[in-house]
């Protein structure tokens, strides 16, 4: 992406994005409204950049047209389906839209539904699937054409913790020999599987690199502090507080600060949640 930008509803939702991506998993992390979905729609040729360009193997994706979309798989945050179609028929419908030959589609659908553990539910109507099942069918349809680029927009939205873990493992399994871009506002979605992390704020990429490099770049330290309950609000006003664990004897605060917040504060290891809080000024959703 070279100086890529996009205006949505007369507001610049994406501004001056510059990055180079290769094979591997890229975690695009940011709060809601940061511009993640707009950027992904640009990468999937749904929205055309108002400025800059997006290249695939040195060629502009809008000029490549269908040749680019043939190597692209996309799972939007909300994807439509005919509720009365069963899983297999839905996959066949998407195969026909993608121009896949029927014999190949039959083999590919069986392979993918087995991979996402949905083959045994192939005759179940889409409207009768759980949220996790729908997401699994969603990633299967995105993989029908064996894409070199797989774009996943908030793929774990609405899933329970067990389904999120299962989905992360599936994404890691599918990432071999392809570029996977996964957007989320939940740190744990990418903490253990992303090769590189991209932090997006106010439509701009404010960091691109590994999790280890991100944590090493933090000048702030992370401290554990035991304080009386009636002092919690004072510390929250003065410091960036990540977690609060209350007990009968008071509260344990996880504080991000360059300086030791109190004499009894204990230094602890930084994690990606701390970096998220430092960059965005708010906590990620449930880990």
Task: State each model region's role.
Residues 1-5, 9:
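Single conserved hydrophobic/aromatic residue that forms the stacking wall/gate
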Residues 52-63, 67-68:
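Conserved ABC transporter NBD signature motif
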Residues 92, 96, 103-121:
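Conserved ABC ATPase "signature" region
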Residues 125-129:
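Conserved ABC ATPase signature
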Residues 150-153:
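Catalytic Walker B motif of ABC-type/P-loop ATPase nucleotide-binding domains
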Residues 167-254:
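ABC transporter nucleotide-binding domain
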């Amino acid at each position: 992406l070279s100086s890529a930008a996009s205006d949505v509803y007369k507001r610049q939702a994406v501004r001056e994005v510059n990055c180079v991506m290769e094979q591997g998993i890229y975690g695009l992390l940011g709060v809601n409204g940061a511009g993640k979905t707009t950027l992904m729609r640009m990468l999937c040729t749904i929205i055309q950049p108002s400025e800059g360009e997006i290249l695939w193997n040195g060629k502009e994706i809008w000029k490549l047209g269908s040749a680019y979309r043939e190597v692209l798989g996309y799972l939007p945050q909300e994807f439509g389906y005919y509720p009365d179609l069963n899983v297999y028929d839905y996959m066949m419908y998407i195969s026909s839209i993608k121009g896949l030959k029927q014999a190949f589609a039959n083999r590919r659908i069986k392979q993918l539904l087995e991979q996402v553990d949905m083959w045994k539910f192939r005759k179940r109507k889409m409207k009768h699937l759980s949220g996790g099942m729908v997401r699994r069918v969603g990633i299967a349809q995105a993989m029908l054409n064996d894409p070199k680029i797989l774009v996943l927009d908030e793929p774990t939205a609405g899933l329970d913790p067990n389904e999120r873990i299962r989905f992360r493992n599936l994404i890691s399994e599918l990432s071999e020999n392809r570029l996977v871009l996964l957007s989320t506002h939940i740190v744990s979605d990418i903490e253990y599987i992303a090769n590189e992390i991209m932090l997006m704020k106010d439509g701009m990429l404010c960091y691109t690199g590994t999790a280890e490099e991100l944590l090493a770049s933090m000048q702030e330290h992370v401290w554990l502090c035991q304080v009386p309950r009636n002092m919690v609000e004072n510390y929250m006003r003065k410091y960036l507080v990540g977690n609060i664990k209350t007990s009968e004897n008071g509260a344990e605060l996880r504080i991000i600060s360059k300086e030791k917040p109190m004499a009894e504060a204990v230094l602890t290891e930084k994690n990606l949640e701390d970096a998220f809080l430092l960059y965005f000024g708010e906590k990620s959703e449930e880990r």
